[in-house]
Amino acid sequence: MASGEGFVVWFTGLSGSGKSTLAAMLAAELPRRGVHVESLDGDVVRTHLSKGLGFSREDRDTNIRRIGFVARLVARSGACAITAAISPYREIRDEQRRAIGRFCEVYCECPLDVLERRDIKGLYARARAGEIKGFTGVDDPYEPPRSPEVIVHTDRESPREGLARILAKLEELGYVRPMAQPAEPARAGLAPPHGGELVDRFVRGDARQRLLERVAGLPRVRLDERGASDLELIGNGAYSPLKGFMTSRDYLRVVRERRLESGLVWSIPITLAVPGEDAARLSLGSEVALASPDGRVVGVLELVDRWTPDKEVEARNVYGATDEGHPGVAYLRSSGDVYLGGEVWLIERPLSPQFPEYPRDPAATRAAFEARGWRRVVGFQTRNPIHRAHEHITKCALEITDGLLLHPLVGATKAGDIPADVRMRCYELLLEKYYPADRVVLGLYPAAMRYAGPREAIFHALVRKNYGCSHFIVGRDHAGVGRFYGTYDAQRAFDDFLPSELGIEPLKFEEAFWSTVVGGMATDKTAPGGPETRITLSGTQVRELLRAGKLPPPEFSRPEVAQILLSATQGRGHDQAA
């Protein structure tokens, strides 16, 4: 802190204008500048400090005075208090400014029509319909600040642009020092898990026996394959910091802002969907037995939330589509219409482990990296065989890291994707012949594909952070399907977040190909020549060759890998290849 004195950053603006997002980003950045931060989110304050207050003018003012009082105490202690509350009335905001002194007001300005289009919670629509009275911006006034320190136009500025201007103002005010760029010290160990702690929800020993005795009398929900995969990945810590299926508060914020309620970056909703008639027989506050697809009771849900989501909004925000030609949208619409939320405990793995000789838990991969002395580990996610282009980018990444986690997805995929057993034979052969054995760990990621493109790319990176990776490869159309996403949309998604928020560095690669000009693998950045000098094939072209009993050219795929695919295609009658 520039002077050692505390200060308050007060975010104000209409509901949905981006206050909480910017507040969370600022809270993640200031500790890097030596500033201790305490956050006061308006929604959280109303459920605790201001519980019981309504929305009259008097109650609103009381709520803001309470927030201001706590913020002032935080600032007096030498820390920064970040508040994010609508705080609609100018007079009460100015009262807090006078009382606090070192005060930076940030107005998140956004036109009302934009906010109503963004309205994932449906609050504006309910207010327009008269279901919510005294709703700020509809039938209760919002008084914009006259002279805020910063105005962020959240309808046309990215969160990163807004954050940069807030930080610049804090530097100008002398509240924080300009960011120095010292050489980063060598890490003493692997990157910490997302949220700081590797979750473990498996029960063992006597606790497991007691849980087994209890589940017999519990109502039961049977999981599908995706739900079973999600349960295992919650249990083994791959989805850290999640300890269960999301509640509505986390879900809504993830769908709207790609963040958990805590402000932590998280881009994919992890939910448990059930039919309405099943949900109706379950009581909040009770336990629910979770059964695997084959009927085994494998865990327990502590049910604390139940709600009916707006699946059209979820489809648009998460998948960028509402067309059922998108497999993620099709799955969403076919799943149960009620979501259940709460923490889980696992008795056993929900799915029978495939390929048990390979690590599938974050604790196991982290132990493998530690045993090898690795600190900088790059993760590579794949649901396809590794052809020459993939080999090229993974080896480029190995040049700047200690080791590679080759991490194929072995959960549910769409029709037409290559079966896991065929892909595993390809990986094993390729690693044996073409990679240094001491630089690669082959692990398993037992998740279902969602085909959510840019959002899933962020999600895959955060999960690999939990597995111990410091870097993550993002190629062309990561986690894409069909023509739903642009070629490099997934790479651009990482630009929406600060590196300190993600805690894992994306390695962005352009499409690789065999160049006849340079006689090797290259990209647009490294090889001259037009399309006629490049050897690359689409998935459709590869499938046509394999159906005809022909191998793809060696410039595209290692002959040994191509032979495995040819044998599998001919033997199974599949038209599957990639």
From Swiss-Prot:
<dbReference type="InterPro" id="IPR020792">
    <property type="entry name" value="SO4_adenylyltransferase_pro"/>
</dbReference>
<dbReference type="Pfam" id="PF14306">
    <property type="entry name" value="PUA_2"/>
</dbReference>
<dbReference type="Pfam" id="PF01583">
    <property type="entry name" value="APS_kinase"/>
</dbReference>
<comment type="similarity">
    <text>In the N-terminal section; belongs to the APS kinase family.</text>
</comment>
<keyword id="KW-0548">Nucleotidyltransferase</keyword>
<keyword id="KW-0511">Multifunctional enzyme</keyword>
<dbReference type="GO" id="GO:0070814">
    <property type="term" value="P:hydrogen sulfide biosynthetic process"/>
</dbReference>
<dbReference type="GO" id="GO:0005737">
    <property type="term" value="C:cytoplasm"/>
</dbReference>
<dbReference type="InterPro" id="IPR014729">
    <property type="entry name" value="Rossmann-like_a/b/a_fold"/>
</dbReference>
<dbReference type="Pfam" id="PF01747">
    <property type="entry name" value="ATP-sulfurylase"/>
</dbReference>
<keyword id="KW-0418">Kinase</keyword>
<comment type="similarity">
    <text>In the C-terminal section; belongs to the sulfate adenylyltransferase family.</text>
</comment>
<keyword id="KW-0597">Phosphoprotein</keyword>
<keyword id="KW-0808">Transferase</keyword>
<dbReference type="InterPro" id="IPR024951">
    <property type="entry name" value="Sulfurylase_cat_dom"/>
</dbReference>
<feature type="region of interest" description="Adenylsulfate kinase">
    <location>
        <begin position="1"/>
        <end position="192"/>
    </location>
</feature>
<keyword id="KW-0067">ATP-binding</keyword>
<comment type="pathway">
    <text>Sulfur metabolism; hydrogen sulfide biosynthesis; sulfite from sulfate: step 1/3.</text>
</comment>
<dbReference type="GO" id="GO:0005524">
    <property type="term" value="F:ATP binding"/>
</dbReference>
<keyword id="KW-0547">Nucleotide-binding</keyword>
<dbReference type="InterPro" id="IPR027417">
    <property type="entry name" value="P-loop_NTPase"/>
</dbReference>
<dbReference type="GO" id="GO:0010134">
    <property type="term" value="P:sulfate assimilation via adenylyl sulfate reduction"/>
</dbReference>
<feature type="binding site">
    <location>
        <begin position="13"/>
        <end position="20"/>
    </location>
    <ligand>
        <name>ATP</name>
    </ligand>
</feature>
<dbReference type="InterPro" id="IPR050512">
    <property type="entry name" value="Sulf_AdTrans/APS_kinase"/>
</dbReference>
<dbReference type="InterPro" id="IPR015947">
    <property type="entry name" value="PUA-like_sf"/>
</dbReference>
<comment type="pathway">
    <text>Sulfur metabolism; hydrogen sulfide biosynthesis; sulfite from sulfate: step 2/3.</text>
</comment>
<dbReference type="GO" id="GO:0004781">
    <property type="term" value="F:sulfate adenylyltransferase (ATP) activity"/>
</dbReference>
<dbReference type="InterPro" id="IPR025980">
    <property type="entry name" value="ATP-Sase_PUA-like_dom"/>
</dbReference>
<dbReference type="InterPro" id="IPR002650">
    <property type="entry name" value="Sulphate_adenylyltransferase"/>
</dbReference>
<feature type="region of interest" description="Sulfate adenylyltransferase">
    <location>
        <begin position="193"/>
        <end position="578"/>
    </location>
</feature>
<protein>
    <recommendedName>
        <fullName>Probable bifunctional SAT/APS kinase 1</fullName>
        <ecNumber>2.7.1.25</ecNumber>
        <ecNumber>2.7.7.4</ecNumber>
    </recommendedName>
</protein>
<dbReference type="GO" id="GO:0004020">
    <property type="term" value="F:adenylylsulfate kinase activity"/>
</dbReference>
<feature type="active site" description="Phosphoserine intermediate">
    <location>
        <position position="87"/>
    </location>
</feature>
<dbReference type="GO" id="GO:0019379">
    <property type="term" value="P:sulfate assimilation, phosphoadenylyl sulfate reduction by phosphoadenylyl-sulfate reductase (thioredoxin)"/>
</dbReference>
<dbReference type="InterPro" id="IPR002891">
    <property type="entry name" value="APS_kinase"/>
</dbReference>
